[in-house]
Amino acid sequence: MSAGHCDRLLDIAYLNFGLSTFWTIFGGYWLLNTWWWHQRNSSALHKALFAMLVLRALCDLFTGLLFTTCPFTGGSVMYLTLAVNTSFTLSCTLQYTCLLLIAKGFGVSRHTLERREISELVTALVVTYLGFSAYNLQPTVLGPMALGLLCGLFCLTLFYTVKTLRKIELQIASYRQHDIPQLIVPTALKWQVVHKFYYLAMPFFLVKIAHMSASEVIVKWFNEAMFDWYLWGDLVGGVLEAVLLGAILALIRARELSPYSSLDYSHDLVFSPMVKGLLGSKASKRIPPKTPVVVVIGPLTGLYGGVEIGFPEQ
């Protein structure tokens, strides 16, 4: 490479150093928020996202250091290239897997997954890892494959997000039907979080797809005039990606919510038959001491009238 190219790559290196600093600061905040300030509200998803932030910071740091070695003749080039490829592959795998988890509502509207969903996520994780690993080995040949993989992850994320929104809407409708207003508000908050995630994930993936597509065009038809376009494209793409991903992380961070926010939604939501049945004038139930009890009391007249509920003194 010419000296002019190396000077421009040095500018890209400064951009990567800046992004690495941003992810390091964000990761420090995430560490305190997850393990200190809101430890009771954190989940496995928040811990996985912290690992992703560490990998993103390392990837940008190693990339910046690699560009400073231009024209890439030093002995450290091989080790820096290996570090960049490894951190890039792991960070992409963890990043897109976490986005799929959020799209399924894990860590936001529920804290469990079905066996079928776990199998789907493991398959997506393996395919993502293998795809980006191959892309690092032959980026000029396998670029279209990586671009297709990214488009597939984009479609899966939007599909799962819409599906999760629909399930939460059905849950809210069921609460309204059975007149349980205490659970409507926290469930509606979950819907808002997933809904905002939908409108943040969409531009995030579009920016990634546009950035990778532009890089593919420049790599295949490279000339002197296109080098400046590569520089500006990397600058704009990197900044937009950092802003959108940071907004997604800020949206789903661990925080204090409603006391009912930890309740998972059920796919087959069935309420007690006693809610629909006619109760007698008295109903008794022996309850062990210090056992938590949830009681929903209807009107004292009408269909459910004459209900008397007693509690043990202990």
Residue ranges and their predicted role:
Residues S2-R115:
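Hydrophobic alpha-helical transmembrane segments corresponding to the first two to three helices
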